[in-house]
Amino acid sequence: MEDRALKSLNHFSIFRFTEEYWRLESADRRDVHRSWFAGLQEVAGLGTVHRYQLFPTEPLADLMLWCAVEADSNEAPAKFFEGFAKATVPHRRYVEPRISLWGLTRRSQYSKSRSRQEVDPFGEKRAPYLIIYPFTKTADWYLMNQETRQGMMNEHIRIGKRYESIKQLLLYSFGLQDQEFVVVYETDDLAVFSQLVNDLRMTEARRFTLGDTPVHTAVYHTPEEALSIWC
């Protein structure tokens, strides 16, 4: 992971295309996409904007956007949110926002060094699948001492290392959204990822999970691939 990824804002937004969008001719739908994404990329600047397909993994949403920008100043989040809104508002007749999940990166208190399994949000290459969900611990978790929590997290980390091909990004959203974290995984094999989650269900730390739904499973697409699906 690059150093700039250690302090970044990652914003995941889920959209549904409206009936008015589907009434457009194919060429006009392409124009909507190109205009909208050009505006979003301008907002992201040196950051990234990635496109993901949701339907048919879930029935009420079509598209997920992942925007990653550096959060190197107090003004950076406000600048991004303002720019995202300005880029999206002209197209609201065609796209309906459904869900937004976002948070900030920081160093983990349970790991002394960076893991090779950390997702680099600014990396050019993306895995075929992305899984994302909100996550909240119980109050009892935070009332335990650091040593006890560290022991349970060590078990969690050991299991994760068995699945070297799966990468994770943990976003902190305490006091910013309803959840405490946003958990993001990248994988090229959904069956292997499902087995990882199954194994993690049997850890002691699982007792202290308050919420980890809804889960969104998305498929990555390049800009041209996205046009071939939605246009």
Where are these regions (language model features)?
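Short S/T/G/P-rich N-terminal loop/turn motif that feeds into the first structured element of a domain
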Residues: 1-44, 70-78, 96-162, 174, ...
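Acidic/polar N-terminal loop/beta-strand segments that form early-domain functional surfaces
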Residues: 16, 52-54, 68
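Short, glycine- and small/hydrophobic-rich beta-strand elements in well-ordered beta-sheets
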Residues: 39-62, 93-107, 157-182, 196, ...
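Short, charge-rich binding segments
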Residues: 56-57, 89-92, 122-124
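A common structural junction motif
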Residues: 84-94, 200-209
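Small/polar loops that bind or transfer phosphate-bearing groups
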Residues: 185
